[in-house]
Amino acid sequence: MPTEQNTNLIPASGFSQLATFQMEDMAEELNGLEGGFDRIKIPSGGMTVFEMPGETEDSPETVKEFSAVILYHHPILQYYREKYTGGSNPPDCGSYDGVTGVGTPGGSCAKCPLAQFGSGENNGKACKSRRRVFLLREGELFPMILSLPTGSLREFSRYIKRLLSKGRKSN
């Protein structure tokens, strides 16, 4: 006589418990630690590879290309009174929404003379437009940040428009 088989491998409630367990573990591990998201460095100055965070800060991984999912993206505006030479020094004025600048001069970005063409080097803008993209790579739990420079914004805009024209969002 055939016996009835139980096809329930894991009760549905087990998944939420597993997720809670993982979140609790992460919260415990991160308790008291500081730091933001790891950053992906875009090729510059003749380089042809991206610099990805490695196991340690001294051993980054270099790749020609990588795959990731866009979780979120937003505009950033940055104005440096002196020419920016890299490093982690904050801009004299910056905006994380592309609307309101914080710092000197601060205020409405749309009305700011530093956000107009002709205010910067080679008739460009003194206040540079960038795009911060939060990416999640396969096998990772935390997003990474890719900060797109002004020269990459046109192609990123085209990509987003292609997605939208197909009825899809980037995230």
Regions found by a protein language model. Name each.
Residues 128-171:
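Extended serine/threonine-enriched, polar tracts that run as long, contiguous segments within proteins
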Residues 1-141:
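OB-fold ssDNA-binding interfaces and closely related basic DNA-contact patches used
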